Amino acid sequence: MIFVQQFEEVRSILEKAKKITVLTGAGASTESGIPDFRSANGLYADANVEMYLSRGYYNRSPKEFWKHYKEIFQINTFHQYKPNRGHRFLAELEEQGKDITILTQNIDGLHQLGGSKHVIDLHGTLQTAHCPKCKSGYDLQYMIDHEVPRCEKCNFILNPDVVLYGDTLPQYQNAIKRLYETDVLIVMGTSLKVQPVASFPQIAKREVGATTILVNEELTGQEYNFDFVFQNKIGEFVEGLSSMK
């Protein structure tokens, strides 16, 4: 009964909210079949991964960098992954006229493929790369088709649009600005272990006074920063909300 009441309350809050911000992590994409790279069995378990994905390694050995980059993120099979119910739910809220912005730690681009227009890619995206000289952009298929992708105009080895270790977060200030404008923060599918993103719920709750909602299978240790906690898969949460119609 309490569970049903929580869903009813959250549905009512979302209907009344003027500005909704959603923070998503790996759990938003695992239901599409994408591995959680930071899990115990994920590719981040390799001790060398942080080096391979670092700005310094790209600068020193760009050809070797691209070899490891493609292996780590399984670039050649990435087209098989499709947006799931959670991605579509957020896009549907936007289609209903809601002012909703997604702050995602994911680099898969599935929020955009699912139809969301206002997405801030905190860690960049796998879907594109660019020339470090002329800034021309290239898509995922171009990266797949070329062992070491180079700019067709300049012949420079492309720079991936993923934020590498050693880079700053270029979208951080945009994310913070949005956070301070929001009525509701929904955190979905993230363990909240990586800073500075781990501080977002506290900012929203303590400084902004927003309503905060957590949807995650595992406890995060930050439950005290949330008004509502759903220990569920995102798809289950969406189905629960949908059943309140």
UniProtKB/Swiss-Prot annotation:
Keyword flag Iron-sulfur: no
Subcellular location: Cytoplasm
Active site positions, chain numbering: H123
Keyword Cytoplasm among UniProt keywords: yes
Chain sites annotated for binding nicotinamide: F37, I107, D108
The reaction(s) this protein catalyses: N(6)-acetyl-L-lysyl-[protein] + NAD(+) + H2O = 2''-O-acetyl-ADP-D-ribose + nicotinamide + L-lysyl-[protein]
Entries under Gene3D superfamilies matching the protein: SIR2/SIRT2 'Small Domain (3.30.1600.10), TPP-binding domain (3.40.50.1220)
Coiled-coil region: none
Keyword annotations: Cytoplasm, Metal-binding, NAD, Transferase, Zinc
InterPro entries the UniProt entry points to: DHS-like_NAD/FAD-binding_dom (IPR029035), NAD-dep_sirtuin_deacylases (IPR050134), Sirtuin (IPR003000), Sirtuin_cat_small_dom_sf (IPR026591), Sirtuin_class_U (IPR028628), Ssirtuin_cat_dom (IPR026590)
Full protein name: NAD-dependent protein deacetylase
Annotated cofactor note: Binds 1 zinc ion per subunit.
Any GO molecular function: zinc ion binding
A GO CC term assigned to this protein in UniProt: cytoplasm
UniProt: Zn(2+) binding residues: C131, C134, C151, C154
PANTHER family reported in the protein's UniProt record: NAD-DEPENDENT PROTEIN DEACYLASE (PTHR11085:SF4), NAD-DEPENDENT PROTEIN DEACYLASE SIRTUIN-5, MITOCHONDRIAL-RELATED (PTHR11085)
Function in brief: NAD-dependent protein deacetylase which modulates the activities of several enzymes which are inactive in their acetylated form.
Cited Pfam families: SIR2
Essential cofactor(s): Zn(2+)
Family according to the record: Belongs to the sirtuin family. Class U subfamily.
Signal peptide interval: none
PROSITE patterns reported for this sequence: SIRTUIN
EC number: 2.3.1.286
